Amino acid sequence: MEKNMSYWHQVPPGPNPPDEVYVVVEIPKGERNKYEIAKEFPGIKLDRIIYSSYVYPLEYGLIPQTYYSDGDPIDAMVFMSQSTYPGVILRAKPVGMMNMVDSGDVDNKIICVCLDDPVYSKINNYREIPEHVLKETENFFETYKKLQNKEVKVTGWEGPDKAKQEIKKAIEDYKKL
């Protein structure tokens, strides 16, 4: 794979991965537009407007210079008190992983908190995030594709050790590209 000027290839995975990573925001909290970092050129493109009336409940993006089992950079969701915009690079701490199956394929998400947000920066494990907020997140992902007749199932949550293990593997797999 040719490594071009995409955010995926040009931004490092973080200042101290896997404990402190960069997350490139693709979709801000509160959006229905599903943006994606372009893999083939610098920039961000609109993938689609989601079919439901739901909006993303948190910042959603990717950890650069990673390669996951789905052939894309590893997905990351960042809990923070304010929304940003596509292309913003956040300093984030992995605190867990949401295990998910999307249309029959594994599509796990790394759960992070923004290190520059005093509301969330002291959280070290996803279990410290209010249970209702986690349920809202789970509900969003299990519901937002229903009008497309696609099934998404959250199959569980894991702690920061598993998340960091997945990040390490994704960084190593990226280096093999």
UniProtKB/Swiss-Prot annotation:
<comment type="subunit">
    <text>Homohexamer.</text>
</comment>
<feature type="binding site">
    <location>
        <position position="48"/>
    </location>
    <ligand>
        <name>substrate</name>
    </ligand>
</feature>
<feature type="binding site">
    <location>
        <position position="107"/>
    </location>
    <ligand>
        <name>Mg(2+) 1</name>
    </ligand>
</feature>
<dbReference type="GO" id="GO:0006796">
    <property type="term" value="P:phosphate-containing compound metabolic process"/>
</dbReference>
<feature type="binding site">
    <location>
        <position position="75"/>
    </location>
    <ligand>
        <name>Mg(2+) 2</name>
    </ligand>
</feature>
<feature type="binding site">
    <location>
        <position position="60"/>
    </location>
    <ligand>
        <name>substrate</name>
    </ligand>
</feature>
<dbReference type="InterPro" id="IPR036649">
    <property type="entry name" value="Pyrophosphatase_sf"/>
</dbReference>
<feature type="binding site">
    <location>
        <position position="70"/>
    </location>
    <ligand>
        <name>Mg(2+) 1</name>
    </ligand>
</feature>
<feature type="binding site">
    <location>
        <position position="75"/>
    </location>
    <ligand>
        <name>Mg(2+) 1</name>
    </ligand>
</feature>
<dbReference type="Pfam" id="PF00719">
    <property type="entry name" value="Pyrophosphatase"/>
</dbReference>
<feature type="binding site">
    <location>
        <position position="34"/>
    </location>
    <ligand>
        <name>substrate</name>
    </ligand>
</feature>
<keyword id="KW-0460">Magnesium</keyword>
<comment type="similarity">
    <text>Belongs to the PPase family.</text>
</comment>
<protein>
    <recommendedName>
        <fullName>Inorganic pyrophosphatase</fullName>
        <ecNumber>3.6.1.1</ecNumber>
    </recommendedName>
</protein>
<dbReference type="InterPro" id="IPR008162">
    <property type="entry name" value="Pyrophosphatase"/>
</dbReference>
<keyword id="KW-0963">Cytoplasm</keyword>
<feature type="binding site">
    <location>
        <position position="144"/>
    </location>
    <ligand>
        <name>substrate</name>
    </ligand>
</feature>
<dbReference type="GO" id="GO:0005737">
    <property type="term" value="C:cytoplasm"/>
</dbReference>
<keyword id="KW-0378">Hydrolase</keyword>
<comment type="function">
    <text>Catalyzes the hydrolysis of inorganic pyrophosphate (PPi) forming two phosphate ions.</text>
</comment>
<dbReference type="GO" id="GO:0004427">
    <property type="term" value="F:inorganic diphosphate phosphatase activity"/>
</dbReference>
<dbReference type="GO" id="GO:0000287">
    <property type="term" value="F:magnesium ion binding"/>
</dbReference>
<keyword id="KW-0479">Metal-binding</keyword>
